[in-house]
Regions:
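Eukaryote-biased recognition of intrinsically disordered, low-complexity regulatory segments
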Residues: 12-25
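Aromatic-flanked redox-active Cys/Sec active sites in thiol-based oxidoreductases
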Residues: 24, 52, 138
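Fe-S ferredoxin-like electron-transfer domains
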Residues: 3-8, 62, 66, 72-184, ...
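Short, positively charged
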Residues: 1, 14, 38-41
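N-terminal cofactor/phosphate-binding cores enriched in small/glycine residues
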Residues: 27-76, 85-86, 99
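Short, Gly/Pro- and small/polar-rich lid/capping loops
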Residues: 4, 12-14, 50-52
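Short, conserved secondary-structure segments in the cores of folded domains
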Residues: 25, 57, 178-181
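Short glycine-rich loop/turn motifs that provide flexible caps or phosphate-binding loops at active sites
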Residues: 23, 31, 58, 165, ...
């Protein structure tokens, strides 16, 4: 292969990459990558709860928020579902981001106070209490849907789902009975980020 063709191939390859900044560091990403994917490629840590690379991201927990600066404007977005854009600057630990993240962790402390993982994550961010009402002190489920998505997308069974809405949302099996579709593979236990499936699994898994 000639040097001319090699240079042309490299140029075309470079044109497929998107250039932007994360925390002042120049980065490159492939078209279709998210901000979170790119950050992880460069070893930049962004906390997540509902994200797992094996399933489609939905950005439900919002813990992975980042600040995006573009054309003199700023916005906060969930990095796991935000595609990269050329020329923008992303901040993963700005004061705006940290304030939003702390507020989310306060909400999580109120919604799933029994989760050791949530309490540890909150403590890392300086959150040791919540201003919100704790309705169920024994609850550890964040309703992130990671377990149900893994059951559907990875296992292909759909043995469990998120039932009800709002504050009544819960991980359940059809008709609120133990699932006859469950193959007891334990995938939901493995991906659960809060430890809630440890007590939910016996309630929803196959008899």
């Amino acid at each position: 292969m000639s040097a001319k063709k090699t240079k042309k191939g490299k140029k075309e390859k470079d044109q497929d990459l998107i250039n932007f900044m994360i925390n002042g560091q120049p980065v490159q990403a492939k078209k279709g990558w998210t901000v979170l994917e790119t950050a992880r490629q460069y070893g930049i840590q962004i906390p997540t709860l509902c994200f797992h690379p094996a399933v489609e991201a939905i950005g439900s927990c919002r813990l992975c928020v980042v600040e995006i600066l573009q054309n003199g404007r700023s916005r906060v977005a969930a990095s796991c579902i935000t595609p990269v854009q050329g020329g923008v600057e992303v901040l993963t630990d700005s004061e705006e981001v940290l304030n939003v993240r702390r507020w989310i962790l306060e909400m999580l402390l109120a919604n799933c106070p029994a989760s050791h993982q949530i309490r540890a994550l909150a403590k890392e961010h300086g959150v040791t209490s919540t201003r919100f009402t704790v309705e169920h002190p024994e609850d550890a489920c964040a309703r992130c849907g990671l377990c149900t998505r893994a059951c559907d997308e990875v296992v292909g069974v759909r043995a469990i789902s998120l039932g009800n809405r709002g504050v009544f949302k819960e991980v359940t099996a059809p008709y609120h009975q133990r699932s006859t579709e469950c193959i007891r593979c334990g995938t939901c236990l493995y991906v659960c980020p809060t430890g809630a499936m440890e007590y939910l699994f016996p309630q929803v898994s196959a008899p």
